[in-house]
Amino acid sequence: MKSFTRMVASFLAFIPIVGASGGAAAQASETKPMDLGNFSVSLNVKDILASKAFYEKLDFKVVAGKLEQKWIVLQNGNARIGLFQGMFDKNIMTFNPGWTKDKETMKDFQDVRELQRTLKSRGITMAPAADEKTEGPAFFMIADPDGNTLLFDQHVPSPKR
């Protein structure tokens, strides 16, 4: 633990030096960061009732879904977890552009197709990709270097610009 603490302290001590020299901090301010939207984790579960009972012990509350269809979404504060039985093979990290943590539609946000174009320009491959010719709800998926799936799933109309 001491070495971890030293590592964090060394990192934190380095930050002002980079900012003062105009290095990484200056470059980061030149481009607006992507706003990926509301984040949740979608878990592939073997027994949805057992998983639901477990997460309820952690004070998660069901906020969406249909238990009879074997999928529910639970929330505790800003943490949101989807439980899905038999719907997909692996766990998925999900970003919902245009949604707040309470599934309220944001007035201004980055459309899923805008996020897709940015990621494509950075060399990331989509599988599947969102149709660039459409507006409104759409999704695309990517995988990180370890094969973890990230889903960008927009449920709301595109922002008016």
Where are these regions (language model features)?
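Core segments of cupin and vicinal oxygen chelate
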Residues: 35, 42-87
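Short hydrophobic/aromatic beta-strand element in the GNAT-like acyltransferase core
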Residues: 71, 80, 92, 139-141
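Residue-level recognition of conserved beta-strand positions in structured domain cores
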Residues: 76, 85, 95-97, 154
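Vicinal oxygen chelate
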Residues: 46-49, 87-88, 95-149
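N-terminal beta-strand motif that seeds the catalytic metal site of vicinal oxygen chelate
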Residues: 3-7, 16-49, 155-161
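Structural preference for beta-strand elements that scaffold enzyme active sites
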Residues: 40, 92-94
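Short beta->alpha transition motifs characteristic of CBS
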Residues: 65, 84-87, 132, 151-159
